Swiss-Prot record:
HAMAP family in UniProt: Fe_S_biogen_NfuA
Cystine pairs: none
A Pfam family matched in the record: NifU
Protein name listed in UniProt: Fe/S biogenesis protein NfuA
Organism of provenance: Salmonella arizonae (strain ATCC BAA-731 / CDC346-86 / RSK2980)
Family: Belongs to the NfuA family.
Gene designation per UniProt: nfuA
Binding locations of [4Fe-4S] cluster: 149, 152
Quaternary data: Homodimer.
Length: 191
């Protein structure tokens, strides 16, 4: 479910040494399954453990996850990274905003999942997003861009070199992607 690197475990163990005996950590998601989902880590004293929690035992600590957050923390990773600028704890939870779909789910659901969990977070940096409108009988994913992507002069490159390559790599049954958007250049456009 959650992978916690050795460096992150050592960091948590150091912090936990200053807490009440038996205190561990809790990993959670606020507003799971929504675009506003946020992940967090907090102290979890012994009296805060619920019967419905999942206990994930690691070498140096135990991480508790509440029942509601658990499916959204699938494939999550916590690391403690040190570079020239200092150290920071990172928590990556690719399924926090949308629950992972099964490998045998319909193609439309699997493509939508990749768009929402992998592609849209990248486009969001430019204020953009992409939506799956349909998959044609011929195997083309019909997409619509919004936000900063609408009217952006780089949208063709994003579509062909970024999105299409990634989707065709993950879904060989697709023939390609097409853009349905009526692009209108304006102040909202990124480039």
């Amino acid at each position: 479910m959650i992978r916690i690197s050795d460096a992150a475990q050592a960091h948590f163990a150091k912090l936990l040494a200053n807490q009440e005996e038996g205190t561990q950590i809790r990993v959670f998601v606020i507003n799971p399954g929504t675009p506003n989902a946020e992940c967090g880590v907090s102290y979890c004293p012994p009296d805060a453990v619920e019967a419905t929690d999942t206990a994930l035992k690691f070498d140096l600590l135990t991480a508790y996850v509440d029942e509601l957050s658990a499916p959204y923390l699938e494939d999550a990773e916590i690391d403690f990274v040190t570079d020239q600028l200092g150290s920071q704890l990172t928590l990556k939870a690719p399924n926090a905003k949308m629950r992972k779909v099964a490998d045998d789910a319909p193609l439309m659901e699997r493509v939508e999942y990749v768009l929402q969990s992998q592609i849209n977070p990248q486009l969001a940096g430019h204020g953009g997003r992409v939506s799956l409108m349909e998959i044609t009988d011929e195997g083309y994913a019909i997409l619509q861009f919004g936000g900063g992507c609408n009217g952006c002069s780089m949208v063709d490159v994003t579509l062909k070199e970024g999105i299409e390559k990634q989707l065709l790599n993950e879904f060989p049954e697709l023939k390609g992607v097409r853009d349905l958007t009526e692009h209108q250049r304006g102040e909202h456009s990124y480039y």
